[in-house]
């Protein structure tokens, strides 16, 4: 698995992957820059040219996938955010701006801001249930090379994302757009077809014998390398010993039953079989480091599509309606769709071939099924954003001001984005090696910032600090299958077992979070970020403190209860849940476990082996409390977080501590949808973590997706959250703050993006920033 995409500890970076984001992780609508509105009402609108100087932004290591189509990690996505503009833009609350051409005035924090973009959008719900998204593009917008941005560039971009061979992280192709399925059918990649045909295939009507030999040579080599990464990871993390058989490693990776003399290919094929022959899907879920497609030398050669049957020549729901207008028709209401339409716009003349574009003849800038021209530009992006890419060298990207930027030429001539260890972020501001970065907001870093400033505050003469609620939240996860009774994860007994642990964990949240974060984080009671409009508020009807009722539904705590009494009450309530789960209770302790349950469980905490994690204190205190009532809790403080993700992928984890990243829309499909109606064949991409299986929850998640009424959806999501809490598969822990720090000596403070939020990052108005010297 890609460790850089994982969201661990107090560092909430995307994934994605998970696309934890809808359209996520790599989609432009979540992250920053161009998607967050052009300049605010304070913008000067200066288009006369940029001034001199260079600003340095420090961030994590980049992977050099700077393509709007194929960027996977947050650091890579930052580059495309600066180089591109998006079809739609969002405001400081994450809401879509519909009238970007003239700009929309919206109030935030008592101030009025104007949000501008490259398009206007009109949404019309039709009587037949379809929905029309009518776009009008702003005149005069140009790419950094001076070429105009037109509706043809938008159409080209959408067809790349919809291509049957597209394998990036965006999921535009999954939207209910009229004609999408018909366009994507009847085409498959050589890669997939050759796998289906097998190594001994004798039919060479679609490829040559030499191609087949090359394919299988490279495929088998990549498979061996893929398995080796798993073996090395299992050995490095103590799951296996050096020299253990492939069978032994596979068993610890969730693939038991292989023969004792199994080979690496046997293991690889077993993984592929689990995913119904889909190697790419298997790789995304099971990788211990590299993706299979990156390990296979000739993958791009075989990623082209070939005809396998009837296929529509176009997507009927994407229509060019005028010189600068476009209509996209959805077959039904989908609350996620508007955010997925906020995609980066890529220039046809750069990523495609203008000679192969003729809208009336169903030609869209590249041969259908062949994205080679797009893939060729992965390391060197071009767009219409505030800065234009120059080079990537020695871990540093150099960019220069885009003199064609539609919302005013940036005041700072150059930007360098350099890879740096997070531990060096604060000191780099002091020493002058960076001007802007996002350090972890730990006690240590907060103290270092205060020490650097002569006034002893977080903002002073050396460093200016801006904090916002992080776009996500911390949690404790409990796998429903591995912490269950009689192998029935959805039974009341199993839920009671998990509630016993959850009750104890919840009792120590206030102590642990205040100790670790001080006033820089707060305890939350529902598994959703406080930044979301769907998050229940203490003043809402039905709001409850998480896991604060006993097995009979009575309150565990009373107002004004002392901490010692609170912890004692939690232990008593937990004992009640253990008893209800089927445990034998004698003299205030559990003495025997029911079938399928245990007297000892493990929780993994990625604290670096030093306990450096916000939930570590919860676990050490819970360990002592549970011991007093007869349950042994093993707290595994991991020096390498990949061990935790490996166990989760292999369905071996019992309990763990981590964090989720959020998106502007609170859709719960990715994490909780289990696809019970189809036997779990297509669950949400992260459902494997909790393995929650609930038809009612599935139905509500889909129901919420099919409405754009925010109040209605909030009601549905509250019911979803209550259902998730009842499963006790997730204990909500904290909403933390994240910070951006600036050099007070080198950046003009009054030009920094005002009223930054979780959705409106520091570079949302980077074109207005100025250097002090």
Please tell me what each predicted stretch does.
Residues 390, 398-400, 492-624, 632, ...:
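Append "and occasionally in soluble cytosolic enzymes with long acidic Gly/Pro-rich linkers
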Residues 51-61, 132-135, 154, 326-327, ...:
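Short, well-ordered beta-strand elements
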């Amino acid at each position: 698995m890609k460790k850089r995409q994982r969201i661990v500890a107090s560092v909430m970076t995307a994934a994605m992957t998970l696309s934890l984001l809808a359209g996520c992780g790599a989609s432009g609508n979540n992250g920053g820059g161009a998607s967050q509105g052009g300049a605010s009402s304070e913008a000067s609108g200066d288009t006369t040219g940029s001034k001199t100087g260079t600003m340095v932004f420090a961030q994590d290591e980049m992977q050099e996938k700077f393509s709007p189509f194929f960027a996977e990690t947050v650091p890579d996505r930052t580059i495309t955010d600066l180089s591109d503009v998006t079809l739609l833009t969002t405001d400081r609350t994450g809401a879509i701006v519909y009238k970007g051409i003239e700009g929309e005035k919206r109030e935030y924090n008592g101030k009025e801001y104007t949000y501008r973009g490259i398009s206007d959008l009109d949404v019309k719900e039709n009587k037949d249930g379809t929905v029309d998204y009518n776009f009008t593009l702003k005149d005069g917008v140009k790419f950094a090379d001076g070429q105009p941005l037109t509706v043809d560039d938008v159409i080209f971009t959408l067809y790349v994302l919809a291509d049957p061979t597209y394998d990036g992280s965006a999921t535009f192709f999954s939207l209910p757009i009229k004609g999408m399925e018909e366009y994507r059918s009847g085409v498959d990649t050589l890669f997939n077809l050759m796998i289906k045909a097998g190594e001994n295939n004798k039919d060479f009507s679609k490829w040559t014998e030499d191609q087949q030999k090359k394919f299988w040579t490279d495929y088998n080599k990549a498979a061996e390398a893929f398995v080796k990464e798993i073996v090395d990871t299992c050995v490095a993390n103590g799951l296996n010993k050096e020299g253990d058989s492939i069978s032994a490693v596979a068993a610890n990776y969730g693939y038991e039953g292989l023969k004792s003399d199994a080979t690496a290919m046997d293991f690889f094929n077993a993984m592929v079989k689990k995913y119904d022959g889909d190697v790419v899907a298997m790789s995304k879920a099971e990788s211990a480091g590299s993706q299979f497609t990156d390990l296979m030398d000739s993958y791009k050669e075989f990623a082209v599509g070939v005809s396998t049957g009837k296929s529509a020549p176009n997507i009927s729901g994407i229509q060019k309606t005028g010189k600068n207008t476009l209509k996209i028709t959805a077959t039904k209401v989908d609350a996620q769709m508007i955010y997925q339409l906020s995609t980066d716009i890529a220039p046809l003349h750069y990523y495609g071939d203008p000679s192969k574009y003729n809208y009336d003849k169903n030609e869209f800038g590249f041969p259908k099924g062949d994205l080679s021209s797009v893939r060729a530009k992965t390391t060197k992006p071009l767009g219409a954003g505030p800065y234009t890419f120059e080079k990537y060298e020695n871990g540093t990207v150099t960019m220069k001001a885009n003199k064609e930027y539609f919302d005013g030429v940036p005041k700072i001539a150059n930007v360098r984005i350099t890879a740096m260890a997070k531990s060096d972020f604060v000191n780099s501001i002091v020493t002058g090696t960076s001007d802007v970065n996002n350090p972890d907001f730990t006690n240590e870093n907060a103290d270092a910032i205060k020490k650097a400033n002569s006034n002893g505050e977080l903002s002073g003469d050396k460093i200016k600090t801006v904090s916002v609620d992080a776009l996500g939240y911390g949690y404790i996860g409990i796998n429903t299958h591995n912490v269950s009774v009689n192998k029935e994860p959805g039974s009341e007994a199993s839920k009671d077992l998990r509630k016993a642990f959850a009750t104890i964990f919840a009792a120590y949240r206030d102590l642990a979070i205040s100790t670790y974060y001080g006033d820089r984080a707060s305890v939350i009671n529902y598994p959703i970020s406080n930044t979301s409009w769907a998050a229940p508020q203490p003043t809402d009807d039905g709001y409850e403190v998480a896991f604060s009722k006993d097995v009979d539904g009575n309150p565990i705590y009373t107002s004004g209860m002392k901490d010692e009494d609170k912890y004692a009450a939690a232990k008593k309530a937990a004992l009640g849940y253990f008893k209800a789960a089927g445990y034998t209770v004698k003299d205030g302790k559990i003495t025997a476990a029911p079938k399928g349950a245990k007297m000892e469980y493990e929780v993994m905490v990625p604290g670096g082996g030093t306990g450096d994690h916000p939930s570590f204190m919860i676990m050490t205190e819970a360990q002592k409390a549970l011991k007093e009532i007869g349950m042994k809790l093993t707290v595994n403080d991991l020096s390498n977080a990949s061990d935790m993700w490996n166990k989760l992928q292999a369905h071996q984890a019992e309990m763990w501590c981590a964090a989720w990243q959020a998106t502007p829309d609170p859709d719960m499909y990715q994490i909780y949808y289990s696809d019970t109606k189809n036997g779990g064949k297509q669950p949400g991409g992260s459902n494997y973590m909790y393995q929650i299986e609930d038809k009612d929850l599935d139905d509500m998640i889909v129901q919420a997706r099919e409405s754009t009424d925010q109040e209605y959806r909030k009601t549905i999501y509250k019911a979803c959250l209550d259902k998730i809490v009842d499963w006790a598969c997730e204990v909500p822990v904290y909403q933390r703050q994240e910070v951006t720090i600036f050099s007070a000596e080198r950046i003009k403070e009054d030009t920094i993006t005002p009223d930054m939020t979780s959705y409106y990052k520091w570079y949302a108005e980077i074109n207005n920033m100025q250097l002090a010297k």
